[in-house]
Amino acid sequence: MERSQKSARKKKKTSKSGNDRSIRSERKSKQKKPAGEKSQKSRRTRKSRGPKGNGFTSRETIQPSSSGQSEGTTRMDDQKDEKKDDKKEEKKEERKEEKKEEVKEPWSEEEPAKRMVANGFFTTTNVGGTFKQTDNFKTPMDSCPSFKNNMHKIRAPDCPIPEEKLVKLTNGPESFICAAKITVPDFNRTMILTQVPDLSSAPDIADFWRMIHQESIASVVIAVMPLEVTLQQILPLLSGTYSTYGKMFVNNKKVESAVGMTEYCLEIFPDGCSNSLLTTVYHLHNWRQKRGLEVVTDLVATMEKVMKVNDNTVLMSMNGTGRAGTMLTLFTAMLQVQKGKEVNAKETLASLRAERCGIVDNIDQFGTVHRSMACWFKNNSTNEEVQRKVVEFAPSIQ
């Protein structure tokens, strides 16, 4: 009995220990995972820990950051390449512009310029001989009654203006002004030569502006030295200022200055009239009376501007004959070339003097016309022979 109980207890213990072993083995088997699962779990664990895990960084955590760096570097490289390409394009455009500047465009006046050079327009003997051979026709005083009756208003009494050539003022107490209308070939606008008004007479200054407004003058070119005339007595010199001359209101809207010329943009209208006129006044201030002009660059540039405007024009000097007449002769010659015609200096001067006696005082002023034409040709012509001839005629032309 006792033996059977002991054997039963042994069997029970044995089964219990077996059960314990099986339980333990199951637990161990549960803890043990396939190698693949273990490595994936470890990688996930390492990845989740990242840089916080005792300074350890797995291969997977490095890859995203290195990829971001490579993308950023690629973008920077692309931007640098784009900048380089932009700079290359800018340099190409600059080279194109430089080439355009180097290669002059064909000048439309090239053919008449070549003919004038070939026919000896730019020779010293031609200038002197032509001037001496040109008559200075003077109109008889008896055929100039208005001129004769207003001698107190005239600076050059030896150069009478025919009645039909005088500018007649309207809407004022006086109708006379010492100004002549000139017919210029191929110029279908009004061209007037006039003297500087008497600065001691306020009515004379007012009459000048009355004429400008009445004749709708777009361009006024004044050739006087500062010592000859205080220009401020004739017009407001500062931008934004204005002056009144009798019933004429003159407003200075803009001023531009060059070396030998100052340009004024003026608004002109009679008192009580809203019909204003915009006029540009060009003042050439380095040209002495009875002399030629030494530096002709600004004179040529001014005549080019007047031709471009192609509107009613006034040319003014102290007496309205010498320097004003020289400017008129130059303007006429340039206009003829622009129309494709060859200039005959003798015929041009003679026809203008028939309009207004006293035009061009002397050979120096006539030489100014030729040197100005040489400067104009030099600045525009691409023909080698034209360039050579004008430089020979006026080596230091400027």
Swiss-Prot record:
Belongs to the protein-tyrosine phosphatase family. Non-receptor class subfamily. Keywords: Hydrolase, Protein phosphatase. Residues 1-15, 41-50 have a biased composition (Basic residues). The keyword Hydrolase applies. One of its GO terms (molecular function) is protein tyrosine phosphatase activity. Its EC number is 3.1.3.48. Coiled coil: none annotated. This is Putative tyrosine-protein phosphatase C15H7.3. Residues 125-376 form the Tyrosine-protein phosphatase domain. PANTHER family: TYROSINE-PROTEIN PHOSPHATASE C15H7.3-RELATED, TYROSINE-PROTEIN PHOSPHATASE DOMAIN-CONTAINING PROTEIN-RELATED. It catalyses: O-phospho-L-tyrosyl-[protein] + H2O = L-tyrosyl-[protein] + phosphate. Residues 18-40, 74-114 have a biased composition (Basic and acidic residues). Residues 1-114 are annotated as: Disordered. Residues 55-73 have a biased composition (Polar residues).
